[in-house]
Amino acid sequence: LGQIPVTEKSKILGIDPGSRVVGFALIGAIKVKPVSPKDWVVLDVGVIRTSTELSMPARLGQIHGAIFDLLSEMAPQYAAIEKAFHGVNAGTALKLGEARGAIIAAFSRRSVPTLEITPAEVKRIIAGNGAASKEQVYQALQALLGFERGRLPLDASDALAIAYASALARLGPMGQAFTNVAKKNPKRS
């Protein structure tokens, strides 16, 4: 994970990819040199739902179009997405890969640099444990950001974790410390 240049007006759009539901979260820096979660604010968060009645190619088109429109509307400096992981179910992994492709193509068409991060990196940065459960990541996000217990959709909270983890992994002492640990333990990151 390399460093990224950030100003107080920088925005990162985090995306949790899926073939049926795509989570998104836009965060913005409020300091010239943001180094902690408190230096960022949540600007928008939500989900994009595709129709399960549509064919997979039609859903991919829907996802691509929705992300393309979000990028136009939100104008982020960076877009962050989870790297593909090896799932137990080959069909599910293939559909996720197709959805990621549609999303990354939208990033590319809008010339928005793509930050990729593994699920284990997100969990380690946000919850302090690369094997944390989704609930533990959600609770850690609550503690870091101080938002109320009202439930975000799971895909939206995952996108929020992706955006924050991508920012923190590349900025300031926390990001540098994570990068150093990852370099020393390449099989664990």
Go through the PLM ranges and name each one.
Residues 1-189:
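Phosphate- and other anionic-substrate recognition elements at nucleic-acid/protein interfaces
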